[in-house]
Every structure is written in C-alpha cells, then in structure tokens.
Amino acid sequence: MDILLQEVGYSYAKDTPFEKRALTDVSLHIPSGSYTAIIGHTGSGKSTVLQHLNALLKPTEGSVMIGERKIEAGVKAKNLRDVRRQVGIVFQFPEQQLFDETVLKDIMFGPMNYGVPEEEASRRAHELVEQLGLPPEVLTKSPFDLSGGQMRRVAIAGVLAMEPDVLVLDEPTAGLDPRGRREIMDLFHRLHIQKGLTTVLVTHSMEDAARYADRVAIMHNGHCVVTGEPEEIFSNEEQLGDYRLEPPRTIRLQRKFEAKAGIKLGAISLTEEALAKNIALALLEGRDSE
Amino acid sequence: MMEKMIFGRFIPGNSIIHQMDPRAKISFVFVFIAIVFIANSAVTYGILLGFTLLVVFLSKIRLYFLINGLKPVFILLIFTFFLHIFFTREGDLLLDIGFIEIYEEGLRQGIFISVRFLVLVFITSILTLTTSPISITDGIEVLLGPFKRVKLPVHELALMMSISLRFIPTLMDETGKILKAQMARGSDIGSGPMKERIKAVVPLLIPLFVSAFKRAEDLATAMEVRGYRGGEGRTRYRQLDWRFVDSLSLLVLAGLAGMLWYFRV
C-alpha cells in the first residue's frame, strides 16, 4: 500500500499559547513494498511524521494519501478504522500499552477490535509468540509479570497480530540489549520479505537504517530534506554532517581503513558482512597485482 | 483534546499578575472566593464579572484560550444552569410548555449561579496559569506556616501539592500517548457507540495507573538518593518578595468587597 505525504505541515496545540510547529512542507512517498528508514536528529519531526501514516494526527496543512484514502487538512475525517487496521504502528516503548489480564488476551485485543474471530486471533497469538522467541507459557501469564524485554515482544506481537499491510516502527528496539535488538530487527526484516509488507522504520541508529532499509529519508527541523537509496545517502558524509548525523560504523571504519591502507574499496559497506567482503576483495586484488 | 486542557498548567509571562508574590495571589483568591458570596443582585454580579475580566486582561492571557481550555467546566455549568431553571418554582411563571415550567426566580438563580461559578473558575485558573507550581507551593507553605504549631505537616502538604501539580501535564501527555497506542490497535475512545467508548476506558486506565505508580516509586527513590529528609531545617533557594503591587491588590480586593456590600440588595 502506497503512502504519500503532500506538502504536509503540522503544529501541535494549534491556536493556543503552546502552539509548536513540528512539520513544514513535508513531501514523502513511501512506495508499496519498500523498507523506508526515516532518520534525523532528536526533535527533527520523525515521530510526528510517523503519526500521520495512520491518521493518528491529521495534517494542519497539506494532505496524506494512505492507500486509497485521502486525509486532508481542514477536512473532517471519519471512520479511520480501516486505515488504522492496514497501518500498524509499533510505538516507542510499546510495552506501555499492555493492559489485559493475560498475554494471550492482550495480543488478541487488536485483531478482535477489528472483527477477527476469536479462534483466528488466538491462532495468530500462538504463532506470533513462537516467532518472537517467547516460551508458550507466557500466554497465560499477566503481561506485568514479564521482564522488560519480554513485555516489548508481547507488545510487538499485539501489533503484528492485526496483520497490517504497512508496519510502522518507532525506535522499536530502544532500551533493549544488543542481542535482543538484532533478533527483533531481523524478525521485522523477515516479515517484511515473507509477507511483502511495506515497512517504515523511524530510528536513531544509522546502522539499522543502513542494514535493513532500501530507501532512506532524512528529517531536519521539521522538513524532509533528502530521500534516496542508502548507498548514496550514507556515502555522502558531508551532507549527513549538515544534518548532524554520522555515517554508520561500518562506513566510518571503511574510511579509516582506506586512509590507512591507501586503497579505495570497490563499494560502500552498509553492513559488517559487506565491509568484510569488500576488504577481502581489495586485499585479494592487491595481492594479484603484485 | 488533551493539549487544550489548562488545569494546573502554567503559562510563563511577565504581566503584572505574573510578577505578583504568590502569597498575595493565593490570599487574593481565597478572599475573592469568600467575597463572591456577598453578591446577590444583577448589579453586584455584573461588578464581579467585570472585575474578573479586568484581571484576565491584566494577566495578558487570551480570553479565547481560557474559554477553550475550560470547555469541560462549561458542561457542568450548563448542567447546573438547567437544574436551577427546571427545579426552582418561585416568582412569576415565564414559560409553560406542558411538562416544562420555567419561573422567573429559576431563571434568575440559574444566571446568578452560572456567573458565580464562571467567576470562580476564571480567577482560580488565572492563579495557576500565571504562577509556577513551585511558587504556588512556596506561597502555601509560608501562608500555612502558623499551623505548624498545631503539628500540621505543612511542608509535607505543600510538597504533596507541588508534586501533584507538577505531574498533571506529565500524566496528560502520557494519557495522550497511550490513547494513541490503543487507537492504533482499534480501540477508540473518541468515536463509536457509547458502549464501545466505555469499553475503551479500561485499556487506557490500566497502563496509566501502572506508569503512575512506577513514576511515584522512581520519584521516591530519587528523593531518597538525594538525601531528602522533610522540611526540618531546610533552607530556601527561592526567596519570596512582597512588593507594593501585592499590597495594592489586596487593597483593591477590599474595595471590591465594599462595593459589593454597598450594592447588595
């Protein structure tokens, strides 16, 4: 499902002394099936953009097209349930939304709100708990008895259980240990490919953006300043610096290596694996030419 | 919706009202609440309303914003207004449509009570809007000082107050966040039939309580760690400063009381 933001502007608490402009003239196209990373410095408007993707916030200027549905500034939008079912959001610290007596009921809450029959919802819950690497016993426990990492996974399962077409992730791994981060990010990537989801990842982590995304958008001071492929965005260090961002670790290491060894690697390394391969290739080439 | 609520909010500014000493403002509000009950006629209520609007004007807070922020209060206001209209049976009969009979006295009472309510809500809102929670607490602590003699835990009361005031906006923001998260999961408190809306309260309240308790615990720990031991022997960093405007404001209030007394029927 395509999402298209056209000249979107948004002010919080409009018409009060607390009015605060968050977005100005943001145009962004999220093509169906893409994995888009939205990166930017703190306070750049990333999270505000994200909430427009399923009409939790309505633009105060411009319009947002979500699939066939158009949400326009100044026009009352009714019956947004369909939109919200199709676009699932995993918020920052999603464990805060847990409330039900048992994990099972909590995961079933979303799908049942959207009219999925009980057996089907329960089936999805069982399946997701397994996919997320949780032991099946947790289903009968209270979500408040789980550890922080487990709560996070349950909350994510609660969103995935709605089987959205578009999955929007707001720093889904903030505060998790490195291994948990990797597992969850890999899971999202697997789902993205298996189910042909459209994924939007809002993140501070350039490494995650470089590793998983096929498109990157940079937000700066409420504007969407650049969009493009990760290779071109992350190889342009100067531009990243302008927006107070750093290239991912792998590229920083690649640059250091290039400077020290005096060789230029063939391609930009977005992941550790790619970096290792690029270095190996360069070294092989160097040996062959000797 | 949440961001328009103004209970317990503080809007920084530098109007005369903002600059007043919190002790003066708090005493002013309490005396004013008492004075309001002197009024009993159209003229006196008119004076009260005029005076209140003057205070709003001096505080440089936009009337529109104030009215918008107090919308929930108006529902209560309208409710009491109609209660008076329908249930007071004195004076001349003004209107009679079958089961509804409206009497002159009912209408009068309805209007008076509404004005009284409005004036009280405005003045108390102006107090919290123009005074930071910290100054309010400082003021209350000093004003209640004499009661320490009878073992009233004044400092603790003031602290409790400032903590609750401090956390109103935080809890509001949190409510908004959880509301959105649940909306994204298809539970919408803002639309749909009444039954659905009531059902949607549980997924909102439980997470809110959980996080409020967690916050309280964190706060207690943070205070403990910094060696908080209550008010005994505690010195103040912020000193209160009573100036001419403060005395003047109380004089004006006395004048207002006199005027109301004079015009009272």
Model regions and ranges:
Chain A
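ABC ATPase NBD Q-loop/coupling interface
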Residues: 14, 63-82
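Helix-to-loop junction immediately C-terminal to a conserved catalytic motif
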Residues: 54
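Conserved ABC ATPase "signature" region
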Residues: 119-137
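Conserved ABC ATPase signature
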Residues: 142-146, 150
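Conserved catalytic motifs of ABC-family nucleotide-binding domains
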Residues: 163
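Catalytic Walker B motif of ABC-type/P-loop ATPase nucleotide-binding domains
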Residues: 167-170
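Conserved ABC ATPase "signature" C-loop
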Residues: 221-222
